[in-house]
A protein has these predicted regions:
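A basic- and aromatic-enriched beta-loop-alpha substructure that forms the phosphate/nucleotide-
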Residues: 77-130, 134-135
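Short catalytic-loop micro-motif centered on adjacent basic/acidic residues
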Residues: 88-89, 160-162, 277-281
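Conserved active-site alpha-helix within GNAT-family acetyltransferase domains
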Residues: 97-118, 147, 285-302
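Acyltransferase donor/substrate-recognition loop-hinge adjacent to the catalytic core
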Residues: 110-194
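Short, conserved active-site entrance elements at the starts or edges of catalytic domains
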Residues: 169-229
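Aromatic (often tryptophan-rich) hydrophobic motifs at membrane interfaces
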Residues: 218-311
Length: 312
């Protein structure tokens, strides 16, 4: 695929393990976004249109030596289209790409030195864990997780995990997802409601797109049944040779321990199938409760993602 080709041109020593840098992730999550890609300075450049304003969903991907020239040209394109340069930005910029480019120019340079004409806004981080930690849950740090899983298996001995098959499970997955949103609305603070609903609108579209293109995107997923009723599902993919990612996960949060159990079991499957050392569960979308859950699994590292604006 075109995007993967340009990712490889970053170089073998520049492995990007952020969840946004795969075709599948962009395809399912951006199904409702108008946009286009272009080759600029021999880089893959992905643009999105919101209303009449143009922005970029990823930084230019390709040979690092072309990065800054491509960024400058992309801002020229956005500025010529937008009603104000303030709307022009590049999202989901991996810190590691910027740092590698800066060091290529000067081993002592920082990204802020090299990109002095730009404003960097730290937006989100990807949570990355050691697969073995998520599988073994060893030590006091994971005591609560082990307890929750034990309660689940003792309370629901009739659970069953099977491979996700969209033609069999699609309607049950959509029903569970809708129920999850309805239940979560009861606990969402009013000041977060607009952001929550926007996030859920995007996720609903992503779930439908995932189910429709599951096979073509070569995704992997499992569903969890209790007494013949679907109570959870999760879907992931391989990012690179060392890292797999979890793209989507939903469980009935009235079934205690269900989320912890399916996450551990899926971690086993991802590790076995892809021989990966790390598992990336994406970012927290800016939701504090999701941040707490992801931090409770003690990430091995947090990969920073920036939005970049041009100084005006």
């Amino acid at each position: 695929m075109v995007m993967e080709k340009y990712l490889l041109e970053l170089g073998e020593d520049q492995v990007v393990d952020i969840s946004d840098y795969t075709f599948a992730a962009n395809f399912i999550w951006l199904g409702n976004v108008s946009g286009f890609y272009a080759t600029i300075e021999d880089c893959f450049c992905l643009f999105a249109m919101s209303g009449s304003e143009l922005s970029m969903l990823l930084p230019p991907l390709g040979k690092l030596k072309n990065l800054k020239k491509a960024i400058n040209k992309c801002f020229e394109i956005m500025n010529s289209n937008n009603s104000s340069p303030h709307y022009s930005r590049i999202d989901y910029v991996a810190q590691c790409i910027l740092e590698k480019f800066a060091k290529m120019l000067d081993k002592d340079a920082s990204i802020f030195d090299v990109f002095a004409d730009f404003i960097f806004e730290k937006k989100l981080v990807d949570y990355i864990y050691k697969a073995d930690d998520l599988i073994s849950l060893h030590g006091n740090a994971y005591h609560t997780k082990r307890t929750e899983i034990n309660k689940f298996t003792n309370t629901y001995p009739n659970f069953k995990i099977v491979t996700l098959e969209p033609e069999k499970h699609a309607q049950e997955i959509i029903t569970l997802s809708n129920t999850w949103v309805q239940n979560r609305l009861k606990y969402t603070p009013k000041e977060q409601m607009d952001d929550f609903m926007e996030g859920m609108y995007q996720e609903k579209a992503a779930i439908k797109r995932m189910l429709e293109y599951y096979q073509k995107l070569e995704l992997m997923g499992i569903v969890l049944y209790i007494d013949e009723r679907l109570q959870g599902y999760t879907v992931g993919e391989k990012i690179n040779e060392g890292v797999a990612s979890v793209l989507l996960e939903k469980t009935n949060f009235e079934v205690l321990g269900c989320a912890q159990f399916i996450f551990r079991e899926f971690s086993k499957i991802l590790s076995s199938q892809y021989s990966c050392e790390f598992i990336n569960v994406g970012d927290d979308m800016g939701f504090e409760n999701l941040k707490k859950v992801k931090m409770s699994y003690h990430p091995y590292r947090l990969n920073t993602k920036y939005s970049i604006y041009q100084k005006i």
